[in-house]
Amino acid sequence: MEARAIARYIRVSPFKARQVADLVRGKDTEEAMAILRYTNKKSAPLIRKVLQSAIANAEHNFDMDSNALVVSQIFIDEGPIVKRMRPRAYGRADVRRHRTSHITVVLREREVK
């Protein structure tokens, strides 16, 4: 049984968010929350919020034990790029590309050995 949570159109670069996602992939939820709490990156609290939502979904929708959950999958997909103009000298303009991300967290129960 798997529980998931998805956050779409998050204003953070997918490349930078993937660096944080790689830290928690395969970890149990308590360890993942601790790692995200003390990671000093912009995407860490955003990913932590999605992880909390996935834990709540697992408890409420599937009656899973929150202490036995593992981050089985976490992936960051690219969202649409928001383009803005930046004025430059002599009447020119540059395009600023604000990247967005879709964050997906999938949890499963730890296998009993």
UniProtKB/Swiss-Prot annotation:
One of its GO terms (cellular component) is cytosolic large ribosomal subunit. Gene3D superfamilies: Ribosomal protein L22/L17 (3.90.470.10). Pfam families: Ribosomal_L22 (PF00237). InterPro entries: Ribosomal_uL22 (IPR001063), Ribosomal_uL22_bac/chlpt-type (IPR005727), Ribosomal_uL22_bac/org-type (IPR047867), Ribosomal_uL22_CS (IPR018260), Ribosomal_uL22_sf (IPR036394). PROSITE patterns: RIBOSOMAL_L22. The keyword Ribosomal protein applies. Keywords: Ribonucleoprotein, Ribosomal protein, RNA-binding, rRNA-binding. GO terms for molecular function: rRNA binding; structural constituent of ribosome. One of its GO terms (biological process) is translation. This protein binds specifically to 23S rRNA; its binding is stimulated by other ribosomal proteins, e.g. L4, L17, and L20. It is important during the early stages of 50S assembly. It makes multiple contacts with different domains of the 23S rRNA in the assembled 50S subunit and ribosome. The globular domain of the protein is located near the polypeptide exit tunnel on the outside of the subunit, while an extended beta-hairpin is found that lines the wall of the exit tunnel in the center of the 70S ribosome. Part of the 50S ribosomal subunit. Belongs to the universal ribosomal protein uL22 family. This is Large ribosomal subunit protein uL22. It comes from Syntrophomonas wolfei subsp. wolfei (strain DSM 2245B / Goettingen).
